[in-house]
Regions:
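Conserved CoA-thioester-binding segment of acyl-CoA-metabolizing enzymes
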Residues: 1-53
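C-terminal alpha-helix plus adjacent terminal tail
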Residues: 1-8, 158-163, 183, 187-254
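Hydrophobic/aromatic residues within transmembrane alpha-helices
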Residues: 13, 50, 62, 108-110, ...
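Hydrophobic alpha-helical membrane-association signature
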Residues: 28-31, 181, 222
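Glycine- (often His-adjacent) and acidic-residue-rich active-site loop
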Residues: 30, 52-88, 101, 131, ...
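Conserved hydrophobic/aromatic "anchor" residues
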Residues: 36, 57, 123, 241, ...
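Crotonase-fold acyl-CoA enzyme core
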Residues: 84-198
């Protein structure tokens, strides 16, 4: 149902239910949680990619389960039905989106830091037509990523947003040829994994934390988050710059 592969510091987590368009059932949600628990705990892991098998990212929660009464066991205080969507990891996750990322699948894509979409990608709140609410972060993350007006356009109409429009909105961060989303996401993940990770994670954590703070609190949090990177990485990085690394836009040596 869920497969995990590793390539050095880059992990790839694949939802593998192509016969269900990678809809997530409770067992798959548990496997996604376990996969990202392992990714978070592995000190050698730097970036994860989340994708789906068979040309579809994820069609959402498995409505066959909901129709059989699975929703009656829903606990709003527990993990999200789609898996890790109520967590904030300390490391970045990139979504590689082929085909549909809709309903809960949209919420999984929104949970990721970045979304690399193929030209075939389709995003949407398709659960609108079935009376199924967004309960895996969709109403929270979507406005933060695309703005309130565009988020409400998607939430109220349930319409499809194709790759070009998603890119223009900032819902997709990269758009590549059909079938190339995973390859492009792996290339991007390798670039991110090559940077000094203490500094990268501190800046990322500050970017997420600032939503909960006033401006003064956010600036102080950013300043405090810079202490460890300055002690452990910045001096060495400044030395490499002084010695000529990175001049002319070349960053092979990090």
């Amino acid at each position: 149902m869920t497969e995990v592969t590793t390539d050095g510091p880059v992990w790839t987590v694949t939802i593998n239910r192509p016969d269900k368009r990678n809809a997530v059932d409770p067992a798959t949600a548990l496997q996604l949680n376990a996969a990202f628990d392992a990714f978070e705990a592995d000190e050698t892991a730097a970036v994860a990619i989340l994708t789906g098998a068979g040309g579809t990212f994820c069609a959402g929660f498995d409505l066959a389960v909901a129709a059989s009464g699975g929703g009656e066991r829903y606990d709003p205080e527990a993990e999200g039905p789609m898996g890790p969507t109520r967590r904030l990891l300390s490391k970045p996750v990139i979504a590689a989106v082929e085909g549909h990322a809709v309903a809960g699948g949209l919420e999984l894509a929104l949970w990721c830091d970045l979304r690399v979409a193929s030209s075939s990608a389709v995003f949407g709140v398709f659960c609108r037509r079935w009376g199924v609410p967004l309960i895996d972060g969709g109403t929270v993350r979507l406005p933060r990523i695309v703005g309130q007006g565009r988020a409400l356009d998607m939430i109220l109409t349930g319409r499809a947003v194709e790759a070009a429009e998603a890119l223009a909105w900032g819902l997709a961060d990269r758009v590549v040829e059909a079938g190339q989303a995973l390859a492009a996401a792996r290339e991007l993940a390798a670039q991110v994994a090559a940077f000094p990770q203490i500094c990268l994670r501190a800046d990322r954590a500050s970017a997420f934390a600032q939503w909960d703070f006033t401006l003064d609190e956010a600036l102080l949090g950013e300043a405090r988050g810079g202490v460890e990177p300055l002690r452990k990485e910045a001096r060495a990085g400044a030395g490499r710059f002084r010695d000529g690394a990175g001049r002319g836009g070349t960053f092979e040596e990090r």
